[in-house]
Regions:
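Acidic catalytic loop of the alpha/beta-hydrolase fold
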Residues: 49, 66-70, 96-101
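Catalytic active-site module of serine/aspartate enzymes centered on a nucleophile-bearing elbow/loop
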Residues: 107-151
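Alpha/beta-hydrolase-fold enzymes
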Residues: 1-49
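Long, compositionally biased charged/polar accessory segments in the mid-to-C-terminal portions
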Residues: 55-57, 61-62, 92
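Short beta-strand/loop motif that positions the catalytic acidic residue
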Residues: 85, 91-94
């Protein structure tokens, strides 16, 4: 399951750029279904590392909280729910390669803030790191966040 998670947090272009179809060095003792590709090795290593560091219950609670959250529940519509948010300014960052939170959802959120007459800034970023780009693409995100807080 963790390997599937890792794959969906990143974009296909990044996987292709980093690994393509590169194989591990040949081994004399290799069995039919042993790890053969570098990407498999990466996924195997990182999934084992992750499992040793995190309690799976954290993800159950996080997943449940995400399932239960609905901004429209607090006003009947997304726009009405967003109108109830009391902030001075809002930053929405969408990443074109994010398949978990697609860019059209971020655009819908920006449109909702616009209709609710909220002070917001919407930034659409290009990054090959997909959903994880907010963690690893410091160069792009830092600039946007810095500018937002210093405007």
């Amino acid at each position: 399951a963790r390997k599937l998670g890792l794959m969906s947090y990143r974009a296909a272009n990044e996987w292709r750029e980093r690994f393509n179809r590169a194989r591990l060095p040949k081994s004399e003792n290799k069995k039919m279904f042993d790890i053969e590709f570098e990407v498999e090795n990466y996924l195997n290593h990182n999934s084992k590392k992750f499992v040793s560091m995190f309690d799976p219950n954290c993800y159950l609670y996080l997943s449940r909280a995400m399932d239960l959250f609905d901004v429209a529940e607090h006003g009947g519509t997304v726009n009405a729910g967003l109108a109830k948010i009391h902030t001075k300014k809002n930053l929405i960052i969408g990443v074109e390669s994010d398949i978990l939170f697609p860019i059209d959802q971020q655009e819908e959120l920006a449109e909702g803030f616009k209709k609710a007459k909220k002070n917001f800034k919407f930034e659409k970023l290009k990054s090959i790191q997909g959903h994880d780009s907010f963690l690893v693409d410091e160069k792009n995100f830092s600039k946007v966040i810095y500018n937002f807080f210093n405007d």
